[in-house]
Amino acid sequence: MHTVESLVMRKKNNILCIAMLVGLLCGCGKKYQYIPKDIETVEVEIVRFDSAQLAVRIDSVKQDIEKLYADYEEFMPMYVEGILRIPTEDTAYLCEMYAQFLTDTVMGFAQTNALAKEKFANVDSLQEALNTGFSRLHYLFPDWEIPAKVYLFVSGFNSSVMYYENVVGVGVDMYLGSDYPYYNQAAAN
């Protein structure tokens, strides 16, 4: 059962994807758009929700999840309902699934979580790329509201990017390389 918020988030994701596709198709006829080097710099904040997620301990899952709700009150409900597709009020099920998510080696979640933690330990280059990208986006579309924050999260192979109101989330486990072996296994299931 999906909530109104999750359906709205899906609709906004679909609209964003369509807008990006239209932009790509319309831009294909032009050679390129000149963007000056001295454009206004837009800085977005990267929020390391992924680090907090992976710091959850098996022996204190319930308390750690409650702490995630307290520390990330804006993002945690969107993550639980929109990415994990678990109703926020079903804490017992969330705790059970989260413990499995942290320890599962059959589907590769434990291995994937460890690799994501290692690969995204330093996000300085990602920060620079996001600032450059959003600066260019702001130059081309000055009326579009640039997200204030970009949350990094681990999705359990559920989502690579999410957009909701003024928040963007990036599933770091979906960016471990095209040859990452657990992608094929997840796709088969």
Region spans (language model):
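N-terminal mature-domain "stem" immediately C-terminal to a signal peptide or N-terminal signal-anchor/transmembrane
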Residues: 29-99
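Bacterial N-terminal signal peptides that target proteins for export
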Residues: 4-16
